[in-house]
Amino acid sequence: MVMRRGNVKNMGDIKDFNCTYDNSAGIRSEVTEGLGLTFPDAYTHCDTMVTLSKVLKEKDKAVICELPFCHTLEAEAMGGIINLGNEIAGPRAGGYVCTDVEEILNLPDMDFTKGRIQETLLACKKLREEGEHVVFEVAGPFTILNVLIDARY
């Protein structure tokens, strides 16, 4: 139910939104052209993330570098299945690892010493060492859960 100026409107059933390749923001082709990076490999290594972040900063005329390039990093570190995408559509959920809310309690703690999360943290550190200001986007609990389990559960 949604309240609008004193009126109640029934919104009906919740509709599933099928997130597809066409729905992804990704990284614009003018950013990736000429960099010699291969995707999705570029989303998984410190040095390529540093390069991408700096080029995005330059192209956007921003004052900060941003990491990571998706909202799946934390869920992946907990065992989430991630589709790393390509140069057009970045990393996104690839499937659910939980089919019941109780299964969430059995997921491992995040391990910051391996995988893409470690590489992203190293990229952040390297950017800072190079004098860059970095915004590190941290996913919240609902975003993380959305990668791990279908919201219907």
Kindly give the residue locations of the regions a language model identified.
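Active-site-proximal, glycine-rich beta->alpha crossover segments in alpha/beta enzymes
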Residues: 2, 83-153
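N-terminal basic, low-complexity leaders that serve as flexible interaction/assembly modules and, when applicable
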Residues: 2-86
